[in-house]
């Protein structure tokens, strides 16, 4: 009788274990606590980011399929590239319906490729899907930076990404070149923070070769080079940027250099008042006055000088923390290996150089203090010590020190945008993805931060711009730098 009795008990045991596992999963993930973690904890952004990308894929497809495409510059881009593909290298002769070609050579090459892929520019729907891919790729790069820094709660980025009609319109309904330039820029920023300097310089120079607004990041990048690399290696990276520009512009520089430089790097170009987003309250005469333009340039330079010292301090602190990371990471890895070995049932042999791999008292104190400071900065609570005596693995998110690098870059760009002679609607992508970071770097309350982002979105969605929307946009540009 014993065997049947034993057999009858086995299924019951299995069902109990299965039920316990399911209950454990449900208790761990399907509850309010985990939902709050996903929304509020910056450390959850890698998980939330995957859902954001999937949702954005659906949103972009719906926008492309349901919202009519608006022709603004796409045909003109194709006409300008067609002239180049037909053998014209004189920039003064490359024109489209909206005027002459005013972008550097990388723009010509990229849109020439799109010219062929889209059947001489006629397959606009295919171009829209290509730009949807550009949007998703750039968003992935942006989310990677935010995940590293752990500065902004995930719900902020979710709301920011899903609620901006203007951004989706610029990418998949207008096909401007600004998204291409910004994509290359964020690729460069990721590479710089990974300390892949030459590749980062290459992408940065390519971004400048698509549109010159990327140069707004250049002052911060110069200081970042100097802080990380020193003078000689900085000169080398600047040479990389310069050589790439020469290679890109070679077909034009070797044939009609003056026309190329005058056309693609024209800093004195006059913008049309009817398209301005930020200076609607000015008369056309004042808007086009060169004294006004020089005044804005002077203000830009003064603000850059004012922020130069704190920027340098931030970058120096970033470099010091990276060096500490390089020193401690091998020891952290070794310490975790030893802890893992201690958990094994086998006898651990005596290690001759045991003390060499152990942390010193100063290093242990630094790790504890640094971890507490990072938890405090992100609003997280310290993890309570476990009741059991089993040792825990050492771990620290050193990438959070990227906060010291990202803020100066984003602030430098914001200063340039705020001092621009004119902003057109597609220029919103220049700084849109950095706005949550800038807002959450201020000491303002949650309500004020959200108000700033909402007001900026309102200003860029007001078409045509009004005196109020232009003035409000300037107000929102002043608030973050004033506190930072």
UniProtKB/Swiss-Prot annotation:
GO molecular function term, any single one: dol-P-Man:Man(5)GlcNAc(2)-PP-Dol alpha-1,3-mannosyltransferase activity
Catalytic activity entry: an alpha-D-Man-(1->2)-alpha-D-Man-(1->2)-alpha-D-Man-(1->3)-[alpha-D-Man-(1->6)]-beta-D-Man-(1->4)-beta-D-GlcNAc-(1->4)-alpha-D-GlcNAc-diphospho-di-trans,poly-cis-dolichol + a di-trans,poly-cis-dolichyl beta-D-mannosyl phosphate = an alpha-D-Man-(1->2)-alpha-D-Man-(1->2)-alpha-D-Man-(1->3)-[alpha-D-Man-(1->3)-alpha-D-Man-(1->6)]-beta-D-Man-(1->4)-beta-D-GlcNAc-(1->4)-alpha-D-GlcNAc-diphospho-di-trans,poly-cis-dolichol + a di-trans,poly-cis-dolichyl phosphate + H(+)
Subcellular localization: Endoplasmic reticulum membrane
Entry keywords, A to Z: Developmental protein, Endoplasmic reticulum, Glycosyltransferase, Membrane, Transferase, Transmembrane, Transmembrane helix
Lumenal side: 65-97, 147-171, 233, 316-403, 448-484
Function: Probable alpha-1,3-mannosyltransferase involved in the N-glycosylation pathway. Involved in glycosylation of the TNF receptor grnd, regulating its ligand affinity. Required for normal epithelial growth and architecture. Suppressor of JNK-dependent intestinal stem cell proliferation.
Protein name: Dolichyl-P-Man:Man5GlcNAc2-PP-dolichol alpha-1,3-mannosyltransferase l(2)not2
UniProt organism field: Drosophila melanogaster
Gene, per the UniProt record: l(2)not2
């Amino acid at each position: 009788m014993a065997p049947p009795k034993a057999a009858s008990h086995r299924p019951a045991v299995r069902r109990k274990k299965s039920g316990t596992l399911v209950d454990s999963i449900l208790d761990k993930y399907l509850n309010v606590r985990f939902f709050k973690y996903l929304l509020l904890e910056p450390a959850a952004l890698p998980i939330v980011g995957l859902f954001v990308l999937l949702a954005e894929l659906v949103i972009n497809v719906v926008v492309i399929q349901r919202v009519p495409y608006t022709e603004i510059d796409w045909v003109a881009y194709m006409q300008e590239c067609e002239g180049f593909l037909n053998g014209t290298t004189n920039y003064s002769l490359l024109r489209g319906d909206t005027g002459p070609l005013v972008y550097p050579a990388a723009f010509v090459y990229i849109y020439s490729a799109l010219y062929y892929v889209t059947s001489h520019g006629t397959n606009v729907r295919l171009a829209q899907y290509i730009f949807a891919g550009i949007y998703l790729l750039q968003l992935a790069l942006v989310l990677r930076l935010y995940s590293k820094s752990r500065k902004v709660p995930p719900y902020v980025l979710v709301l920011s990404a899903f609620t901006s009609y203007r951004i989706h319109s610029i990418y998949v309904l207008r096909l401007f070149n600004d998204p291409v330039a910004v994509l290359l820029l964020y690729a460069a920023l990721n590479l710089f923070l990974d300390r892949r300097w030459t590749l980062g310089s290459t992408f940065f120079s390519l971004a400048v070769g698509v549109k010159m607004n990327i140069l707004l990041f250049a002052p911060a990048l110069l200081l970042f080079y100097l802080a990380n690399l020193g003078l000689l290696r900085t000169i080398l990276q600047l040479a990389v940027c310069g050589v790439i520009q020469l290679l890109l512009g070679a077909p034009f520089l070797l044939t009609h250099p003056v026309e190329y430089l005058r056309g693609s790097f024209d800093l004195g170009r006059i913008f049309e008042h009817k398209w301005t987003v930020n200076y609607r309250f000015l008369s056309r005469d004042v808007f086009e006055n060169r004294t006004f333009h020089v005044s804005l340039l002077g203000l830009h330079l003064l603000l850059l000088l004012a922020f130069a010292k704190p920027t340098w301090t931030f970058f120096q602190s970033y470099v010091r923390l990276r060096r500490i990371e390089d020193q401690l990471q091998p020891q952290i890895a070794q310490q975790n290996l030893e802890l893992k070995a201690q958990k094994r049932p086998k006898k651990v042999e005596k290690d001759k150089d045991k003390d060499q791999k152990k942390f010193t008292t100063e290093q242990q104190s630094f790790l504890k203090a640094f971890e507490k400071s990072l938890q405090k900065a992100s609003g997280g609570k310290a993890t309570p010590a476990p009741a059991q005596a089993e040792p825990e693995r050492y771990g620290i998110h050193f990438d959070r020190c990227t906060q010291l690098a990202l803020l100066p870059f984003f602030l430098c760009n914001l200063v340039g945008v705020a001092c621009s002679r004119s902003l057109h609607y597609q220029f919103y992508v220049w700084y849109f993805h950095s706005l949550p970071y800038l807002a959450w770097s201020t000491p303002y309350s949650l309500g004020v931060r959200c108000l700033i982002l909402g007001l900026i979105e309102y200003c860029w969605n007001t078409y045509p711009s009004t005196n109020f929307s232009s003035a409000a946009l300037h107000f929102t540009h002043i608030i973050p730098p004033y506190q930072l």
